[in-house]
A protein has these predicted regions:
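Detector for the c-type heme attachment site
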Residues: 212-213
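Extracytoplasmic c-type cytochrome modules immediately beyond a signal peptide or single-pass transmembrane anchor
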Residues: 24-207
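Short intrinsically disordered, low-complexity coil segments enriched in acidic
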Residues: 1-2, 17-21
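Bacterial N-terminal signal peptides
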Residues: 9-19
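Bacterial N-terminal signal peptides that target proteins for export
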Residues: 1-11
Length: 213
């Protein structure tokens, strides 16, 4: 009997350096949870940009109102719905201290990316602006990495960008994510220790929704 599989769009991969020994990294669930939350927030940003494509690409409007502040409100709501964490009140949330430090920095990087594209987004008389989720995600991740040295990427098999091509471990993770028995709810992840125990790699699956098929 053929095993049923589910199509996946790819995975988010996060390399989080924490300078611990190999055994300590495995025991440090805080590092893994921080990586998971960062992946969910980054994906929430991509989803938000995707949901606003009709507005962004409307040639009849000048000022779209899709400001960094408007983006922040939407992505904060989406992240709260998915991760059950309120970015506006992180001090009261039961999340790792590392996450309390890094989540606002990722949000700032995403807002800065939206700010950079304001002249493009608000250009009248032009349809497609090129400000798509992939572009947003790459540039926001680069800004975040420059400030924190935490590396984020989205990969798939095959990958459109050779620089983001999955390695053997990521290919195996994607195969596991594609199994019909793998949970589709709860933002489940796969993690491993890398760089001689100095960092942890966290992978979050991205599944195709009905609207993508």
């Amino acid at each position: 009997m053929k095993r049923a599989e589910v199509l996946i769009a790819g995975v988010f991969v996060i390399f989080l350096g924490i300078g611990l020994s190999s055994s300590a990294v495995f025991a440090d669930s805080d590092a893994v949870e921080t990586g998971r939350l960062l992946a969910v927030l980054h994906d929430s940003g991509r989803v938000t940009v995707g949901a606003n494509q009709p507005l962004i690409n409307d040639p009849d409007k000048g000022d779209k109102g899709f400001t960094p502040e408007a983006f922040e409100k939407q992505v904060t709501d989406k992240f709260k719905d998915r991760a059950k964490v309120n970015l506006a009140d992180l001090k009261s949330e039961k999340v790792p201290e590392m996450a309390k430090k890094l989540l606002p920095q990722l949000l700032d990087a995403m807002k800065a990316t939206v700010a950079d594209y304001q002249p493009v987004i608000n250009r009248p008389g032009v349809g497609f602006k090129g400000f798509i989720p992939a572009t947003f995600g790459t540039q926001a991740a680069a800004k975040f990495r420059a400030k924190t040295n935490v590396y984020l990427k989205q990969t798939a098999n095959p990958s459109r960008n050779p620089k983001n091509a999955p390695d053997e471990f990521e290919l195996k993770a994607m195969a596991k994510f594609a199994e019909a028995s793998y949970p589709r709810q709860g933002e489940k992840i796969i993690s491993e220790v890398v760089d001689g125990g100095k960092a942890v790699r966290v992978m979050l699956p991205l599944f195709y929704g009905k609207g993508c098929l």
